């Protein structure tokens, strides 16, 4: 098995924000290579940790690394949008904290066979869950022009969505687009030369957009956070690390909605209890990686940590 290096981002900050209780029940919604999982486990005595990942490779790698799983740890090979169902199956209806480390892990990016990266020539795949049928090849070759424009614009915030989608539409009538490098060349051809020279790799935004569409990432995140807000006990916290603006905007909006005072008539001397929010923002502004972390882990640059706490039912 190929070894892939993975540095867990905001390791101490994200777990410290959970304020772990030794006897509590916690969820790591994104197991990855187990960095946050181990950090939480180290603080548990009689408590319990359930770690989710839809990527079979992540489950297998962490299982092998542990050898024998600690009795406090349960691994669940499911998407975190199945949070409530999976926990109910385990007899759990309330938890003390939930952690999310969103996006693609370094091993997924660095495994050329997975097709997540524009740096390697590989089959167009991008599935986090290898059990699903929809992959990047299907989207690129079969989705209508209008749908390609929509996802490139909405999920990639790509200014040249129409031009790139048109190049793809024309090319696939000649032969199927099956590899990442084929797609990269079409993306480059759809972006004016001057624009290609700025803003990083020209394929970055479109690859992000296709990956989000393949894995239905934003819908899964919204659904999972809605469940998480209901699952946590009073005093429990949700800790979320995001790596791009779409995720961060969604988390920020959802957290703001549930932590804000409901509409009440002006001039009331006291806000009634019924209008008080059930949650509070632990950090008004996102927590960012330290200079020390940025110096050793370049993939931490875009990371933001947001934390919310349930203060009453």
From Swiss-Prot:
Would you indicate the residue range of the signal peptide? none
**GO process terms (BP):** rRNA base methylation
What is a single molecular function from GO for this protein? rRNA (cytosine-N4-)-methyltransferase activity
* Assigned keywords, A-Z: Cytoplasm, Methyltransferase, rRNA processing, S-adenosyl-L-methionine, Transferase
Q: Which residues bind S-adenosyl-L-methionine?
A: 34-36, 53, 80, 101, 108
GO cellular component terms listed in the entry, alphabetical order: cytoplasm
Subcellular location field = Cytoplasm
- What does the record give as the reaction this protein catalyses? cytidine(1402) in 16S rRNA + S-adenosyl-L-methionine = N(4)-methylcytidine(1402) in 16S rRNA + S-adenosyl-L-homocysteine + H(+)
Domain of life assignment? Bacteria
Identify the EC number(s): 2.1.1.199
**What is the role of this chain?**
Specifically methylates the N4 position of cytidine in position 1402 (C1402) of 16S rRNA.
Give the UniProt family note. Belongs to the methyltransferase superfamily. RsmH family.
Can you say what this protein is called? Ribosomal RNA small subunit methyltransferase H
* Gene from which the chain derives: rsmH
């Amino acid at each position: 098995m190929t070894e892939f290096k993975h540095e867990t981002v905001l390791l101490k900050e994200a777990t410290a924000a959970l304020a772990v209780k030794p006897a509590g029940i916690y969820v790591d919604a994104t197991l990855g290579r187990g960095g946050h999982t181990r950090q939480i486990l180290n603080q548990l005595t009689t408590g319990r940790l359930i770690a989710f990942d839809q990527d079979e490779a992540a489950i297998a790698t962490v299982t092998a690394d542990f050898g024998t799983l600690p009795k406090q740890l349960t691994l669940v090979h499911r998407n975190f949008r199945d949070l409530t169902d999976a926990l109910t199956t385990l007899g759990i209806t309330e938890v003390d904290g939930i952690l999310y480390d969103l996006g693609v892990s370094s091993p997924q990016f660095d495994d050329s066979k997975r097709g997540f990266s524009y740096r390697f020539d590989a089959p167009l795949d991008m599935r986090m869950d290898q059990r699903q049928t929809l992959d990047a090849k299907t989207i690129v070759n079969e989705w209508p022009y209008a749908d390609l424009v929509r996802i490139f614009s909405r999920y990639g915030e790509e200014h040249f969505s129409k031009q790139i989608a048109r190049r793809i539409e024309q090319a696939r009538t000649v032969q199927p687009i099956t590899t990442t490098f084929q797609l990269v060349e079409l993306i480059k051809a759809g972006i004016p030369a001057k624009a290609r020279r700025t803003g990083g790799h020209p394929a970055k935004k479109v690859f992000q957009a296709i990956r989000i569409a393949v894995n239905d990432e934003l819908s899964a995140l919204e659904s999972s956070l809605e469940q998480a807000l209901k699952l946590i006990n009073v005093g429990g916290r949700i800790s979320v690390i995001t790596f791009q603006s779409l995720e961060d905007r969604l988390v920020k909006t959802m957290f703001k909605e549930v932590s804000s005072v409901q509409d009440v008539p002006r001039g009331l001397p006291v806000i009634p209890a019924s209008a008080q929010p059930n949650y509070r923002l632990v950090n008004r502004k996102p927590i960012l990686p330290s200079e020390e972390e940025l110096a050793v882990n370049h993939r931490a640059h875009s990371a933001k940590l947001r934390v919310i706490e349930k203060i009453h039912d």
